[in-house]
């Protein structure tokens, strides 16, 4: 076990495959180049080895079967002794520690009053107090303690709130459900309430609590941790247990794992116990010990064992975040990004020279690569969620330079494959449930992050021009001319096409029902908002294409809702809870969209009179959506659905009244509205669009954008350019190294321009590609060619058939006859850059339209 002990204590010795591939347990270790034909145990005993994934001798003894790499042949590599000695002497003199680095980050972000990093947080907190917590004239609410989040609730909450914040920030339907979520803006609220003065608690003498626990007790609590913790996918159970057995385990990592386990394992629930807790089992003592171990850890040890350090940091950061300690959590997670970035660079650089080692037939390098990938996506998801709450843009990540998504299911997970091969299967079902949630979280994060940054970096010309001083306005105009890009009215169409392709991929590739339902609900909800995206200040007429797309989205959402009660129950209740809440928000968005469509519908247009069958179908959809809102499985979200039910009940009758008159007779809009209001006198929709509270904010108005308006009317239509922000803070937000040029420290992720127009097309399409023109992959596909004549025929087609709305739904029907056009590329390229305006105030949320329906019954 000596060779494996070195790997457990020093993960940098483990291999790094060029690309993760499917694991084949039938492949013998003798076929792997660079490995001994005999396992470590057989070579030590000098007995014949069967050379299987788990040899017969190790299987009989029920021990780990390890195949170590062969010794290098030839002369050893010459090393520069002078440079190495000089660097070692310099390192000994400076003796930097992890605690010093974390404390420096804490001071720069939250204590210091100068610098872009501190201004980023402090200005966001000030804007939050001004615009979110602004007391009403009627009363000043008393401050209430912010409720904490459990671990599984926080993990499930991330994806849901990212979608919700995107809709509230750039959607067209207001923010009625803002107050219905007690954890809304959890990060910025925790940051605004916190007054922690330092990164670490005052030092005190403390004996190691691990020695007093005993190995058997430690192993049992580790099993319990893998049973209950939602982040179990960032730790390999087999590698951790082997390190405990060999006494090479990272004490900080083990202490934080035991702290979480003992906190969940409450002996007070057992009536046969006295309820007393021994000091070595105190979660606070273990947590303090883990933080102290990391605080005094030399940075050289971090570089030698980066994976275990990153695991301890992300678990500590997650615990602090769930407790509402946002300051320390930001630093822990930020430094985790830095550690993962360095290891990612090192593994990419040394990919061809890495030695391979197998444990029970599984490549340890693939296991470590999966762990790093899972930690990376947790960091990215948390950072994206936090930056969206503080209303700041962030660096877009080039997809070909980031790790792959986490494993879609347990069959492709090297971590779980190793646990099965090692017979560590007691907590496997819980580990599978925890691992399955990382994939939809990563999918939603990557999608929402790009849409958020696109909208945030493509505001209206009016707001940005007025934001610049008069004596520099011409400089911004020249810069806009230099950075030509597509017309902003095309943005919704581009995003719509990309989301449709993402929906097609999810429907085709994802087999887990709960994951598929959550992703489809989230993306269809975004599409509903995009159809009425407030990109223009004046409302545009509703077109048959808008009616068609909205009808197909509602039909798909109804299909998903019909399947929700039959979905298998998740072992993590919070995941099912927030997935169901996402459906409630989706139904609320559909109700807003139907009311908006009715209020802006012009019956005097001939093409609108011809769309009467489509409106009848929408009325039926409104009726079915109203029935879904009354379902028992949505009963916990009455605060969201109560106004939605009122809107749906009203718009159902209003749309039917709109279609009662013969289409051959022109009917005025006022007559139709009066007919609808005759049945519901207490309900009369307002036609005034939402207004901006102050210049400079992106509109949350009610202007509906026709898809025809997305297409320039003439080849000479001038494209709109984007005015760059007034301030560009340090893009290396979490990095202290000049080579790390991005928010998360990964190389090559910060670019000088978020858009690059290389196409001569008059519409200046936005297409997503890499720097070398290659496609990003299945997730980021090319946008449709909106100048193609087939798209016009698609938009002019019959709104939608009269088939059952809860059957045969999917992206193909949303695409219409032009679905085949979604894969066309114009060759334009997509770059990224971190644009921040730290002085920009937090957006003032406009009130929703629920007040219109406050007196209307369900």
From Swiss-Prot:
Keyword Zinc carried by entry: yes
Keywords: DNA-binding, Metal-binding, Nucleus, Transcription, Transcription regulation, Zinc
GO biological process: DNA-templated transcription; positive regulation of metabolic process
Cell location: Nucleus
Pfam family, one: Fungal_trans
InterPro entries: TF_fung, Transcription_factor_dom_fun, Zn2-C6_fun-type_DNA-bd_sf, Zn2Cys6_DnaBD
Annotated DNA-binding residue span(s): 39-65
Chain spans, region Disordered: 1-35, 72-99
Disruption-associated phenotype: Loses the ability to produce pyranterreones.
Role, per record: Transcription factor that regulates the expression of the gene cluster that mediates the biosynthesis of Pyranterreones, a family of antioxidative compounds.
Name recorded for this polypeptide: Transcription factor pytR
Lineage: Eukaryota, Fungi, Dikarya, Ascomycota, Pezizomycotina
């Amino acid at each position: 076990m000596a060779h494996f002990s070195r790997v457990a204590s020093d993960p940098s010795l483990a291999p790094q495959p060029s690309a993760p591939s499917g694991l084949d347990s039938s492949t013998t270790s003798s076929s792997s180049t660079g490995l001994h034909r005999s396992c470590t145990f057989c070579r030590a005993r000098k007995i014949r080895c069967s050379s299987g994934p788990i040899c017969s001798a190790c299987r009989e003894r029920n021990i780990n079967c390890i195949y170590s790499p062969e010794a290098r042949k030839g002369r050893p590599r010459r090393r520069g002794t002078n440079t190495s000695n000089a660097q070692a002497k310099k390192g000994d003199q400076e003796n930097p520690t992890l605690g010093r680095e974390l404390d420096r980050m804490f001071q720069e972000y939250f204590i210091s009053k100068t610098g872009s990093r501190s201004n980023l947080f402090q200005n966001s907190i000030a804007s939050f107090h001004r615009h979110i917590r602004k007391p009403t004239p009627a009363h000043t609410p008393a401050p209430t303690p912010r409720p904490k989040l459990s671990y599984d609730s926080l993990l499930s909450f991330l994806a849901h709130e990212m979608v919700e914040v995107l809709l509230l920030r750039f959607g067209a339907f207001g923010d009625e459900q803002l107050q219905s979520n007690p954890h809304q803006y959890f990060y910025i609220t925790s940051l605004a309430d916190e007054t922690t003065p330092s990164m670490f608690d005052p030092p005190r003498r403390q004996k190691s609590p691990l020695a007093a626990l005993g190995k058997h007790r430690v192993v049992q609590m580790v099993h319990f941790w893998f049973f209950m913790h939602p982040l179990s996918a960032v730790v390999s159970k087999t590698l951790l247990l082997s390190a405990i057995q060999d006494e090479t385990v990272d004490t900080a990592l083990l202490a934080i794992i035991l702290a979480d386990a003992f906190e969940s394992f409450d002996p007070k629930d057992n009536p046969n116990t006295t309820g007393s807790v021994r000091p070595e089992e105190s979660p606070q003592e273990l947590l303090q010990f883990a933080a102290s171990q990391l605080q005094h850890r030399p940075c050289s040890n971090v570089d030698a064992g980066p994976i275990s350090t990153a695991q301890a940091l992300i678990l500590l950061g997650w615990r602090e975040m769930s407790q509402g300690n946002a300051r320390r959590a930001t630093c822990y997670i930020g430094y985790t990004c830095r550690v993962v970035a360095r290891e990612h660079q090192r593994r990419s650089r040394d990919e061809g020279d890495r030695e391979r080692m197998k444990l029970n037939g599984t490549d340890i390098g693939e296991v470590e690569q999966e762990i790093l990938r899972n930690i990376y996506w947790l960091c990215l998801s948390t950072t994206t969620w936090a930056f969206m709450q503080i209303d700041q843009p962030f660096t877009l990540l080039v997809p070909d330079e980031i790790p792959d998504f986490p494993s879609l299911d347990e069959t492709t997970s090297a971590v779980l494959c190793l646990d099965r091969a090692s017979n560590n299967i007691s907590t496997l079902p819980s580990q599978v449930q925890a691992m399955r949630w990382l994939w939809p979280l990563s999918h939603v994060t990557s999608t929402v992050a790009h849409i958020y940054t696109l909208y945030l970096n493509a505001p209206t010309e009016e707001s940005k021009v007025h934001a610049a001083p008069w004596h520099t306005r011409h400089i911004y105009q020249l810069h806009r001319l230099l950075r030509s890009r597509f017309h902003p009215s095309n943005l919704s169409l581009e995003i719509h096409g990309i989301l449709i392709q993402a929906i097609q991929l999810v429907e085709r590739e994802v087999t887990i029902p709960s994951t598929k339902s959550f992703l489809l609900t989230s993306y269809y909800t975004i599409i509903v908002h995009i159809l009425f995206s407030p990109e223009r200040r004046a409302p545009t007429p509703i077109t048959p294409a808008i009616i068609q797309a909205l009808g197909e989205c509602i039909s798909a959402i109804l299909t998903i809702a019909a399947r929700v009660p039959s979905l298998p129950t998740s072992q993590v209740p919070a995941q099912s809870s927030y997935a169901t809440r996402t459906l409630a928000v989706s139904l609320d968005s559909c109700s807003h969209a139907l009311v908006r469509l009715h209020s802006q519908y012009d019956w005097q247009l001939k093409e609108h009179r011809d769309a009467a069958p489509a409106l009848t179908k929408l009325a039926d959809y409104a009726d079915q959506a109203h029935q879904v809102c009354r379902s028992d499985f949505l009963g916990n979200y009455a605060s969201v659905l109560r106004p939605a039910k009122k809107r749906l009940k009203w718009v159902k009758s209003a749309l039917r009244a709109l279609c009662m008159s013969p289409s051959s007779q022109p009917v005025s809009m006022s007559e139709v509205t009066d007919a609808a209001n005759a049945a519901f006198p207490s309900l009369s929709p307002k036609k005034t669009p939402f207004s901006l509270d102050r210049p400079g904010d992106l509109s949350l108005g009610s202007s509906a954008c026709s898809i025809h308006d997305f297409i320039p009317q003439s080849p000479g239509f001038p494209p709109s350019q984007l005015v760059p922000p007034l301030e560009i803070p340090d893009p290396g937000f979490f990095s202290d190294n000049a080579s790390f040029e991005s928010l998360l420290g990964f190389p090559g992720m910060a670019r000088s321009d978020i858009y690059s127009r290389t196409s001569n097309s008059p519409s200046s399409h936005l297409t997503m590609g890499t720097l070398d023109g290659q496609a990003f992959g299945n997730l980021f596909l090319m946008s449709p060619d909106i100048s193609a004549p087939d798209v016009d025929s698609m938009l002019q087609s019959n709104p939608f058939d009269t088939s059952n709305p809860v059957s045969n739904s999917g992206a193909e029907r949303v695409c219409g006859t032009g679905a085949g056009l979604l894969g066309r590329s114009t060759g334009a390229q997509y770059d990224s850059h971190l644009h921040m305006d730290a002085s920009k105030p937090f957006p003032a949320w406009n009130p929703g339209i629920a007040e219109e329906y406050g007196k209307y019954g369900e």
